[in-house]
């Protein structure tokens, strides 16, 4: 198992926990900031050089932010695009040929329910997740019959460290409505089941599935009106 993340301390802690539970599991860790193109290139070159036999790629790294786009941090926007889009695409490209060659493999891309709709206040984040979902669907079609499966995990709000990092402009954590919140453990279980069942899209939680169904059935003019009202209300609450 190879673990890649920014924080060495968290990587070491996770490796320790995994090896305590699975003593025979070999775990290798790489401290990489995927928002840094040079570090991403170093990682992909290592992948190529070592000719790694990857059976499952989980593209889990992600960045988010909240607030009006006009006052957003350009550097943060670029970092979101680099991590959520560029790194995911690059890593997938580097492991895919050998998966196809051995006619087996799995790719789990962590997208978001935000990727199905434009989200005022999270314009860049939602757009990057829209890319992930579309990319996953297209790749899945290309790989039909190769033995390689592709699944996009599209959760709604989940209680994780992500919400503490992706804060609103007023400093509040970015946590969604209580009724759609799903425990992290359920998200993991649903992701594994979805990948094993070769599902194209996995949306954990009944409430979030219902919300997404209603959103898809809503006529676009009405949806635009609702999005404008949501944006106005959210802006008023943050002042």
What are these regions (language model features)?
Residues 1-13:
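Conserved glycine-rich Rossmann-like NAD(P)H-binding loop of the short-chain dehydrogenase/reductase
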Residues 42-45, 68-71, 75-82:
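Active-site Tyr-X3-Lys motif and surrounding loop/helix of classical short-chain dehydrogenase/reductase
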Residues 112:
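Residue(s) in the substrate-gating loop at a strand-loop-helix junction
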Residues 142-207, 239:
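SDR active-site lid
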Residues 92, 128:
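Active-site helix of classical SDR
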Residues 60-65:
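Conserved NAD(P)H cofactor-binding loop of Rossmann-fold oxidoreductase domains
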């Amino acid at each position: 198992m190879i673990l890649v993340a920014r924080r060495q301390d968290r990587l070491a802690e996770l490796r320790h926990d995994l090896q305590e539970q699975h003593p025979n599991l070999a775990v290798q860790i790489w401290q990489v900031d995927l928002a840094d193109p040079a570090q991403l290139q170093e990682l992909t070159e290592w992948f190529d050089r070592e000719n790694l036999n990857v059976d499952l790629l989980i593209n889990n790294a992600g960045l988010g932010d909240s607030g009006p786009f006009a006052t957003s941090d350009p550097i943060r926007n670029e970092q979101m695009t680099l991590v959520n889009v560029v790194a995911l695409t690059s890593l997938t490209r580097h492991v895919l040929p050998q998966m196809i060659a051995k006619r087996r493999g799995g790719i789990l891309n962590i997208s978001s329910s935000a990727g199905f709709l434009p989200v005022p206040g999270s314009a860049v984040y939602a757009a990057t997740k829209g890319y992930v979902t579309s990319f996953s669907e297209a790749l899945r079609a290309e790989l039909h019959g190769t033995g390689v499966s592709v699944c996009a995990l599209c959760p709604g709000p989940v209680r994780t460290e992500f919400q503490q990092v992706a804060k609103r402009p007023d400093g509040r954590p970015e946590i969604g409505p209580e009724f759609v919140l799903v425990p992290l453990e359920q998200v993991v279980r649903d992701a594994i089941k979805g990948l094993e069942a070769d599902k194209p899209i996995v949306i954990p939680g009944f409430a979030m599935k219902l919300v997404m169904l209603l959103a898809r059935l809503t006529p676009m003019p009405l949806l635009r009106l609702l999005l404008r009202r949501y944006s106005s209300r959210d802006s008023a609450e943050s002042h």
